[in-house]
Swiss-Prot record:
Changing residue 466 to G: Abolishes interaction with ORC1. The keyword Nucleotide-binding does not apply. Keywords: Centromere, Chromosome, Nucleus, Repressor, Transcription, Transcription regulation. This is Regulatory protein SIR1. Pfam families: Sir1 (PF11603). Changing residue 479 to N: Abolishes interaction with ORC1. The gene is SIR1. Its main location: nucleus. Changing residue 477 to P: Abolishes interaction with ORC1 and SIR4.
């Protein structure tokens, strides 16, 4: 270090104001004011000083490492949070909304801010040389989230999502923590499932925190802080608590502080959100503290082993008491609980890697599945937009049908009031059912739309004219005159083709027609040329849960429902040598959904007949039955498929 005057010094090429403890740009006009003596200024100009503009030119990031431990001993450092982007840049956390690149890592370090008038702001931080030890109180940290770790994701009626991390129950929709022993939560989940989840995951950490005399609770998993978002900087301090016999035992508490003095990060919880029995007049906040320090504080005389022991000892006592209280509540409520639990509760596993990609909750299971599969962000957004359109179409159609039933009671306000209770409940239930149908069908429908099905057989794609009348294409021999496929072993070919033409056919990898006898259902194919040159007929089939076509049921097989599942499909018939007929169809074409219009007409006639002929009580019961039918899973599932076909055919026509 070279001392220029009583205030300025040069340290490893950096001009430092030792009074204000900050670096100074030697090109700044204030340098001359601080060095009125010409000799001092001349001595400074002879030094090989760092050119600040090179810092920005040499780096695309705002965080720049400097290999000078001596420099950072004489300047002030503040704690700042940064994002490491997938293109290698490091930027300040607060400008994340402007990003176009994925955040790879979140990091925090103590650094010093430098302002360059033409180049903007950069932050310098200490970068170690070989065999150098880090400065006391200066080290980098980042939230260390294991991308493969999985967590229980609890869904209540699809639209409410919770996650459990180290015993803390986090309501993802609002990024807010919940106590497990909460009356509203218990009624929402239902007593039976509430008790089961408690025994499986025991998410009572927030209940414990509110019951502690200490105002802090350690957490190891950084994902909790990442999801909660807003963090505060804290430090531990010793206090003397009043004890028995005049003794004053040593006690540790957490206190908010500045970034320069912080040793840990934490999430602050206001005591105003705690139950009245847990509120403390002396402390406004309690803190969930990240167990790993953000700095190695070698100056502090605090013993962290004592701090952890304090929490562990106190928490174990509180945990046993809370478990006993909750068990008692479960026993009491179980004896008097006769209500049927109607809410739809599901528990799934979700990885932290997937959670890190989600900016807003709730998120559908379809989106979670696509994220887990590593699908592109733009593709996922398109799927979500398609899902919104399908949901809108289904809701509009179902609501219209329900409104027609509701209008039946316009002349009887008392009966309409009774019906409205069932009506509004049905609306809530069918929206949940639609979400479940989306999870069951949407991805399968998209795969069908994208023509991603694999054919039942891999046929040859060669195209070659054997004669002006016969064409080989898609593994078939096509008779262009009769516009149909013909069996390569057909005896008629002996007179219709010459010897060398038949020899040519024998050398080709064509479909063996005897193989078709193995199939009872129509066969899906990817064979554009075949369907182009062959005559097709319209035939009714049944579409199964796998979206493939099946033959109509016989008397021995009545498990299908023909009116609901029947579709009309274009297909190519082929006559086998045992005089049975097999059907080939293009699996990239969505068949016509035949049952929709006839079914709607039937329901409409039934509705008019019902409203004209029934007594009021019977009319009410029949209206409830019809409403339940319209909001049933099978009916909504059929409407969802029809809506998809409507969108698909609309895009095709465009």
């Amino acid at each position: 270090m070279l001392q220029i005057n009583s205030r300025l010094a040069v340290i490893d090429g950096w001009l430092v104001d030792t009074v204000k403890r900050k670096p100074i740009n030697f090109r700044s006009p204030e340098v001359r004011l601080l060095l009125p003596n010409d000799d001092d200024y001349k001595k400074l100009s002879q030094q090989n000083l760092v050119d600040w503009t090179r810092l920005k030119k040499d780096s695309n990031s705002v965080l720049v490492g400097v290999k000078s431990m001596e420099l950072f001993k004489h300047i002030k450092l503040v704690l700042r949070e940064f994002f490491l982007l997938e293109d290698g840049r490091i930027i300040l956390k607060r400008i994340r909304s402007k990003l176009r690149y994925k955040v790879v890592k979140k990091l925090t370090c103590k650094c010093c801010r430098l302002y360059l008038p033409k180049w903007g702001t950069v932050y310098i931080h200490p970068m170690l040389k070989d065999k150098e030890k880090p400065l006391a109180g200066v080290c980098e940290f980042s939230l260390d989230v294991n991308p493969d770790r999985e967590y229980p994701l609890i869904e209540i009626n699809v639209s409410h999502q919770y996650i459990i991390i180290e015993g803390f129950l986090l309501y993802l929709n609002e990024r807010r923590l919940y106590r497990w022993n909460d009356n509203n939560l218990r009624s929402q989940v239902g007593l039976t499932k509430w008790a089961h989840l408690r025994k499986t995951y025991n998410p009572v950490s927030l209940d414990i925190l509110y019951s502690l005399n200490s105002n802090f609770y350690f957490v190891k998993d950084d994902l909790l802080f990442q999801l909660l978002g807003k963090r505060v900087f804290v430090k531990f301090c010793k206090v003397m608590e009043n004890g028995k016999c005049g003794k004053a035992p040593l006690w540790y508490r957490v206190k908010r502080t500045t970034t320069a003095k912080a040793t840990h990060i934490a999430y602050a919880i206001s005591n105003s959100t705690a139950p009245d029995s847990f509120k403390s007049k002396n402390n406004d906040y309690r803190f969930i503290v990240r167990e790993k320090p953000i700095v190695e504080n070698t100056i502090s005389n605090l013993d962290y082993s004592d701090i952890k022991k304090q929490q562990f000892t106190e928490a174990e006592v509180v945990k046993r008491k809370i478990s006993a209280d909750i068990s008692q509540i479960e026993n009491v409520h179980t004896q008097f609980n006769s209500q049927k639990e109607k809410n739809n509760i599901r528990v799934n596993k979700v990885s932290s890697e997937v959670l890190d990609q989600i900016s807003k909750f709730p998120v559908s299971r379809v989106t979670l599945l696509l994220m887990s599969a590593g699908q592109d962000k733009n593709y996922i957004e398109l799927v979500e937009e398609l899902a919104r359109r399908l949901e809108k179409i289904c809701i509009e159609k179902t609501t219209q049908s329900l409104e027609e039933i509701r209008d039946t009671f316009q002349a009887n306000p008392e009966m309409q009031a009774s019906f409205d209770k069932e009506y509004y409940q049905s609306i809530e239930e069918y929206k949940i059912t639609l979400e479940l149908i989306k999870e069951d069908l949407l991805i399968t429908l998209i795969k069908q739309m994208e023509n991603m099905w694999a054919a039942e057989k891999k046929f040859s794609t060669e195209e070659e004219y054997v004669s002006p009348r016969f064409l080989v294409a898609d593994g078939f021999l096509i008779d262009l005159a009769e516009e149909k496929p013909i069996n390569p072993k057909d005896p008629r070919l002996l007179t219709l083709l010459k010897d060398h033409q038949r020899a040519m056919i024998d050398q080709m990898n064509l479909v063996k027609w005897n193989d078709f006898k193995k199939y009872q259902d129509p066969i899906p194919l990817k064979a554009k040329t075949l369907f182009k040159f062959c005559k097709q007929i319209k035939k009714k089939f049944l579409r199964g849960a796998d979206f493939k076509l099946h033959t109509l049921p016989t008397e021995a097989n009545l498990k299908y429902e023909p009116e609901r599942m029947t579709v009309l499909c274009s297909c190519v018939p082929i006559l086998l040598d045992d005089q049975t007929v097999q059907y080939l169809y293009d699996d990239s074409i969505i068949p016509e959904f035949e049952a929709t219009s006839s079914y709607a007409t039937k329901q409409s006639k039934c509705g008019r007949k019902m409203s004209l002929q029934m007594e009021p009580d019977l009319l009410f019961q029949e209206a409830i039955r019809r409403m339940r039918h319209l909001t049933a899973y099978d009916v909504l599932r059929r409407n969802y498929i029809a809506a998809f076909e409507e969108l698909y055919m609309g895009n095709c026509n465009d």
